C-alpha cells in the first residue's frame, strides 16, 4: 500500500523506517486513534509515502509481494476499482504457502547514453527504464498486441510498469519522448531464450492433455523450455529437449513465463476453460492454434500380466457427476464381457470392486499402464486414467455425458452419450464447477433428475457401442 502511495495504519515490528505509516498495537482504540491521526493530516501522510518508495529497495518489495500474492497487477498507483482490491484481498486471504518467486531475467538495451531499459515477459510483460539524467522528463510507454494498442501510459525515468495479461501475446513495447520520437522499440522474440511453463494443476488428466503443447511451443519458437508438472516422470524420457523441474523450484535466467491451469480469469487465459476442449486450455495460454495432439508417455511395457484376453476398466473418479450412476450399469457390462470370454481388471485405485471383475491391489502408475497396455481395450469415465490409457495408445471407451464430446479426445475413442436428457453442463458457460460439492449438479441437484446424464445411459447402450471391439 505504501508503495502505491496509500498511508497505512498497522502493526510493524521491523527496523525499516516506513514513512507514511502510523504504527499501532493490536488494540481497537489505538487503531482508531491512528486512523484519526492520518485523516487529520492526510496530504502530509500521502507525501511521506514517497520517502518509503525512495528508501525501500524495490526488489525487496516485489519479492515479498510475489510470495504473498499469486497475481500482481500494476502497483504503481492505488486501487482503481473494488474488483482489483478484492482480487488482492482474496489471494491474501487464501493463506496458502507459495513457493519462492521465479528469478526474472532482464534484458538491458541502451538506446541513448542517458537511458537504460530492462524488459522481460515473465508472468506478463514488464518494462523499466532508468536514467542518470533528467528524472522529471515524461515519456510515453505503449504495449501492443501485434499491431493493436493494449495499454499506454506516461512514465518518468527510474520507474517500471507491467501488465496484468499473463497468457502468450506477441508483445511489442515502445517508449517515446515528448516530441513523439521513439527511444525504445522492441518486439518480443523467444528464439534462443529461456521460457518457463508451469502447470498449475496436479491432475493426471490435465498433465497428460497439456504436455504435447509444451513441446509444440518449444519447436514453434525455437526456445529453451523449462517445464514444471506434478507428473514429470511420465514425460521426461519422451521429451528430452524440455528441461523438467519440480513445482516450486527456483528457475533462473528467464525471458518469459506462462502458467497453465483453470483460472477463470481473463487476465490469465483468453477463454473460460470450462467452455472449451481441455487441450485448448493450454493452446490458448501458449498462443498455439488448437488441434488434438497425442501425448507421449514414458512407458516401457513388461511381460503380459494375465494369460488370456481381458479388458481394463476404471469406475472411480473425483466428482459425483463423473460417475456412471446407472444402478446396474457396471455389473451388467462386466457380466456381458465375461460371457464373451473376457476377464475384467478394475484398475481404479479407490472404491468398491465390481462383481465379476478383479481389482488391482498394486496400483502404481507403472503397473496400471502395463495392465492397460496388454488389455484389449479400456473402459472408463472422463478421468485421468482414460487420458493415461489414451496416452499409451489404447482404445478408450469413455462413458461421459456431462461434458461435450470434444472436451476430452476424439481419436481412438468410442464415446458413450445420451443427448436425449440433460447433458453437457460442464461446458455450459452459465455454470462454474464447485470442487467442494461432491453432488454438484447445477440444474437438478436435490431432485429425482440429479445426475440423469449418466443414470440414463443403460448397459445396453454401452454394449451396443463396444460390439465392434469384441473379438
Q: What are the roles of these predicted feature ranges?
A:
Residues 21-29, 37-42, 416-417, 456:
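Conserved acidic donor-binding segment of nucleotide-sugar-dependent glycosyltransferases
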Residues 36-43, 66-78, 286, 290, ...:
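Short, hydrophobic alpha-helical segments
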Residues 43-80, 452-457:
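A charged, aromatic-enriched C-terminal amphipathic alpha-helix characteristic of glycosyltransferases
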Amino acid at each position: 500500500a505504501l508503495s502505491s502511495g496509500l498511508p497505512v495504519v498497522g502493526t510493524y515490528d521491523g527496523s525499516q523506517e516506513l514513512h507514511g505509516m502510523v504504527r499501532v498495537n493490536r488494540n481497537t482504540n489505538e487503531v482508531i486513534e491512528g486512523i484519526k491521526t492520518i485523516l487529520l493530516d492526510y496530504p502530509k501522510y500521502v507525501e511521506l509515502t514517497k520517502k518509503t518508495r525512495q528508501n525501500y529497495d524495490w526488489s525487496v518489495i516485489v519479492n515479498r509481494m510475489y510470495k504473498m500474492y499469486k497475481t500482481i497487477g500494476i502497483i504503481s498507483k492505488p486501487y482503481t476499482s473494488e474488483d482489483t482490491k478484492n482480487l488482492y484481498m482474496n489471494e491474501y486471504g487464501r493463506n496458502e504457502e507459495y513457493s519462492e518467486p521465479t528469478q526474472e531475467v532482464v534484458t538491458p538495451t541502451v538506446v541513448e547514453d542517458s537511458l537504460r531499459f530492462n524488459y522481460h515477459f515473465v508472468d506478463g510483460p514488464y518494462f523499466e527504464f532508468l536514467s542518470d539524467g533528467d528524472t522529471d522528463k515524461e515519456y510515453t510507454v505503449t504495449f501492443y498486441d501485434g499491431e493493436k494498442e493494449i495499454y499506454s501510459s506516461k512514465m518518468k525515468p527510474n520507474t517500471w510498469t507491467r501488465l496484468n495479461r499473463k497468457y502468450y501475446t506477441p508483445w511489442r513495447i515502445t517508449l517515446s519522448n515528448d516530441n513523439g520520437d521513439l527511444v525504445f522499440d522492441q518486439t518480443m522474440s523467444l528464439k534462443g531464450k529461456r521460457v518457463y511453463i508451469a502447470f498449475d494443476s496436479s491432475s493426471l488428466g490435465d498433465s497428460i492433455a497439456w504436455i504435447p503443447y509444451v513441446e509444440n511451443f518449444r519447436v514453434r519458437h525455437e526456445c529453451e523450455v523449462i517445464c514444471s508438472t506434478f507428473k514429470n516422470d511420465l514425460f521426461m524420457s519422451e521429451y528430452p529437449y524440455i528441461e523438467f523441474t519440480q513445482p516450486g523450484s527456483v528457475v533462473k535466467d528467464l525471458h518469459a513465463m506462462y502458467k497453465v491451469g483453470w483460472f477463470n480469469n481473463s487476465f490469465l487465459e483468453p477463454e473460460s476453460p470450462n467452455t472449451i476442449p481441455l487441450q485448448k486450455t493450454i493452446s490458448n495460454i501458449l498462443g498455439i492454434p488448437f488441434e488434438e495432439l497425442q501425448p507421449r508417455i514414458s512407458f516401457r511395457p513388461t511381460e503380459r500380466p494375465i494369460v488370456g484376453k481381458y479388458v481394463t476398466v476404471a469406475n472411480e473418479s473425483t466428482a459425483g457427476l463423473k460417475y456412471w450412476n446407472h444402478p446396474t450399469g457396471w455389473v451388467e457390462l462386466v457380466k456381458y464381457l465375461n460371457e464373451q470370454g473376457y476377464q475384467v481388471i478394475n484398475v481404479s485405485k479407490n472404491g468398491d470392486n465390481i462383481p465379476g471383475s478383479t481389482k488391482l491391489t498394486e496400483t502404481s502408475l507403472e503397473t496400471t499402464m502395463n495392465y492397460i497396455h496388454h488389455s484389449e481395450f479400456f473402459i472408463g469415465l472422463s478421468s485421468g486414467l482414460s487420458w493415461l490409457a489414451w496416452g499409451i495408445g489404447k482404445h478408450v471407451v469413455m462413458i461421459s455425458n456431462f461434458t461435450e464430446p470434444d472436451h476430452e479426445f476424439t481419436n481412438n475413442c468410442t464415446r458413450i452419450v445420451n443427448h436425449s436428457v440433460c447433458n453437457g453442463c460442464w461446458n455450459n458457460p452459465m455454470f462454474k464447477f464447485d470442487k467442494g460439492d461432491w453432488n454438484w449438479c447445477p440444474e437438478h441437484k436435490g431432485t429425482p433428475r440429479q445426475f440423469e446424464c449418466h443414470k440414463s445411459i443403460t448397459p445396453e447402450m454401452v454394449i451396443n457401442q463396444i460390439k465392434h471391439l469384441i473379438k
